[in-house]
Amino acid sequence: MTAKIFIDGEHGTTGLQIRSRMADRRDVELLSIPQEQRRNAALREDLLNSADIAILCLPDDASKEAVSMLAGNNNVRIIDTSTAFRVAQDWTYGFAEMDKAQGDKIRSARCVANPGCYPTGAIALIRPLRAAGILPDGYPVSVNAVSGYSGGGKQLIAQMEDESHPEHLTVNNYVYGLNLKHKHVPEMKAHGLLDRAPLFSPSVGRFPQGMIVQVPLFLEDLADGATVESIHAALSAHYAGQDIVKVVALEDSAKLGRVDAEELVGQDTMKLFAFGNPGTGHVNLVAVLDNLGKGASGAAVQNMDLMLSA
């Protein structure tokens, strides 16, 4: 049976990517609202309520409004890509590889909150260490990351690419979120199983897509006996048996001179690396992903496929 899918916000960066990924599929029927009609609330509500799955690619407030339009209609399942519901108790977090049971939870859920791009990498690195008891309570986790500028949506893309834009940017890299109140921190804490908020420092580079997320650690402050080998083993065990999150072998990581933020552009996978210096007791965990792939639209389509397989 063909599933009806409505992408609310299909003309934005994430919406366009999701639509493109489903353009040639015959198992789904894409319901669409013309761009000139996108502010027609009645038409939008009708399409939302006509779908089997509504994928919301909207700002937080608009997503909340869309969900309110579906109140009482349990026939429509929802995937929301905003930050509005990522720590809500009655929503399922849409990171299927987060633990062994998460894929089944997504499969049976009515409401799925698609993860943020930065949290996808951070949680992938942090949660297995918390689950294994390696990362203790109270540890001051810091997360440093750089994203391609497409993560800022159409406005930032225009600022980076259009030289005639009144706010054209010529910088190659900048740090933001300087007030340390980035909207992705709550989901990093909640789904990373942390008991205190991580210190998150995001930045943007002059490349369209791609992402690196880093979590530096001090071995002396981890569980007794922790080594880069035991950390790598915990990551490997956590993601064993699936093919989306790949943990790079320690011997292969040791041969690298650099890690490329753009390595997985156009792919929906993620790579995790563990680097260590036994002499200093320093470890650096690194995640590489496409911010619009596993970090956004790819994850949304993956979640949709899980929900359709129920």
UniProtKB/Swiss-Prot annotation:
Catalytic reaction annotation: N-acetyl-L-glutamate 5-semialdehyde + phosphate + NADP(+) = N-acetyl-L-glutamyl 5-phosphate + NADPH + H(+)
The protein's Enzyme Commission number: 1.2.1.38
Family annotation (CDD domains): AGPR_2_C, AGPR_2_N
GO BP terms: L-arginine biosynthetic process
Keyword annotations from UniProtKB, A to Z: Amino-acid biosynthesis, Arginine biosynthesis, Cytoplasm, NADP, Oxidoreductase
Domain of life, per lineage: Bacteria
Family stated for the protein in its record: Belongs to the NAGSA dehydrogenase family. Type 2 subfamily.
Catalytic residues (UniProt): C117
Pathway: Amino-acid biosynthesis; L-arginine biosynthesis; N(2)-acetyl-L-ornithine from L-glutamate: step 3/4
The name this protein goes by in its record: N-acetyl-gamma-glutamyl-phosphate reductase
One Gene Ontology MF term: NAD binding
Compartments (UniProt record): Cytoplasm
Primary role: Catalyzes the NADPH-dependent reduction of N-acetyl-5-glutamyl phosphate to yield N-acetyl-L-glutamate 5-semialdehyde.
GO CC annotation, single: cytoplasm
Enzyme class: oxidoreductase
Provenance organism: Allorhizobium ampelinum (strain ATCC BAA-846 / DSM 112012 / S4)
Pfam families tied to this protein: Semialdhyde_dh, Semialdhyde_dhC_1
Listed PROSITE patterns: ARGC
